[in-house]
Amino acid sequence: MLTVLSPCFASAEWASLPRHRADWDDATMDGRGASKREQKAAMRAAVLAARRAMPAAARAEAASSLTAAVLTLPEVMTARIVAVYVSIGTEPPTAELLDVLRSRDARVMVPVLREDLDLDWAIYETREQLSPGAHGVWAPEGPRLGVDAVADADVVLVPALAVGADGARLGRGGGSYDRALARVPAGRPRTALLYDGELLPGVPAEPHDQRVTGVVTPSGARHLVDGGP
């Protein structure tokens, strides 16, 4: 049974992070506080430290629960084309999810990181076709669909380090998914996959940062905002 997450929640490891969006607003380098860029860097470091401390058994359990939660989403179950990332490192795992989506006859597109950090796309068939590409990101062999192919997806599932209750997404800082999500038509679901505890009251955001419309964690899913930029 799907658990709908409360509007904002946080576990104990987030106690050291600012709890309200106002804590991040309009701080500058003039002595009043850290810049948005510095705030993002601090939050990234905290999230990554918490993820690295997660036991392997907990990560494996999270993978199964995350897959189950994603598959309860109507927009995923009815999608003809799903765009989803190939997880690496401490990202919420997608290996199981990719195979399940493929077994349901959905057309599964995965990102191919380019040298300029933009995202091309390719069709996922099996794990065996994956090989490490730019910056160690795994991608399929075969034809590239172009950076605009993500606009054809009925739903886009993206990685994130944290998401605010208003849909603001904290990524790795390269801007890859900001560029990709900017190509997704308004109204299309764009959902971030997270671990429990990573949906926060607010995260620092800048004008170019693209928002997500919902999140899925091992504990369930939550709709945040309607589709749009």
Name what the model sees in each region.
Residues 2-152:
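N-terminal active-site beta-alpha-beta segment that forms phosphate/nucleotide-binding
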Residues 88-90, 161-165:
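Short glycine-rich anion-binding loops that position phosphate/pyrophosphate groups of nucleotides
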Residues 2-38, 42, 49-53, 132, ...:
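Surface-exposed, charge/polar-rich loops and edge strands
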Residues 99-103, 172-183:
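A short, gly/pro- and small-residue-rich
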Residues 86, 160, 219:
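Glycine-rich, N-terminal phosphate-binding loop of Rossmann-like dinucleotide-binding domains
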Residues 140, 159-161:
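A structured binding-face within diverse protein domains that lines the active/interaction site
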Residues 47, 84, 108, 157, ...:
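A residue-level signal for conserved active-site and pocket-lining positions in enzyme catalytic cores
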